[in-house]
From Swiss-Prot:
It comes from the Bacteria. GO terms for biological process: diaminopimelate biosynthetic process; lysine biosynthetic process via diaminopimelate. GO terms for cellular component: cytosol. (S)-2,3,4,5-tetrahydrodipicolinate binds at residues 148, 157-158. NAD(+) binds at residues 7-12, 91-93, 115-118. Catalyzes the conversion of 4-hydroxy-tetrahydrodipicolinate (HTPA) to tetrahydrodipicolinate. NCBIfam families: dapB. This is 4-hydroxy-tetrahydrodipicolinate reductase. Belongs to the DapB family. NADP(+) binds at residue 35.
Amino acid sequence: MKIGVYGASGRIGKLLLEELKGGYKGLELSSVFVRQKCETDFSSFSHAPLVTNDLKAFVRACECVIDFSLPKGVDHLLEALLECPKILVSGTTGLEKETLEKMQKLALKAPLLHAHNMSIGIMMLNQLAFLASLKLKDADIEIIETHHNLKKDAPSGTALSLYETCAKARGYDEKNALTTHREGLRSKESIGIAALRGGDVAGKHTIGFYLEGEYIELSHTATNRSIFAKGALEVALWLKDKAAKKYEINEMFG
């Protein structure tokens, strides 16, 4: 399958290019979208990709777009994909309502998956969190996330997705159950998120289920950002030959 990388100059974008250099599990890097000059030397790649700032040409040259860019960039990408539908794997966070609506329109034409975190471990953590939230009905749930000191958003998109998973399992009102700045006593039907920022931490997420006399903590730690690139490529492989639809990350595990 031919892969197009959108957001190639970013941290994850560069890792995607590195993973695709030798052809990841048969995937071929066919196009790279860049607004300015690309620093990557493609002479060592098994296939020389199209490197362009022409969005339409970029989309035409691939079968699947993997996006790790910025919210405004995703909006432009979706406009091109609505004209020329291709599989989309997007890990960009902070999307506006209008952009998400365009994504839903694309899902009528092509398979796509949008997730805050593409690591296989986080995919499994979401499933475990759902099960624990469902079975441990009397437990108080708290989420702690830690990231590097340059991360812009807080709480992280991954922490919010874990919150949504737990809230859905409990049947909580997702709009009102979230607590990020706690004062006074804890309300029963609430889930707290604490965001820590420091150093160069790639990402750590812990979900605590606190009972009387005992507690359980489920934790995931990213020690290398390459897991996000590899996870996105695994999603691309999984979406191949799928019907047009917006898929959820937990569907990969059945």
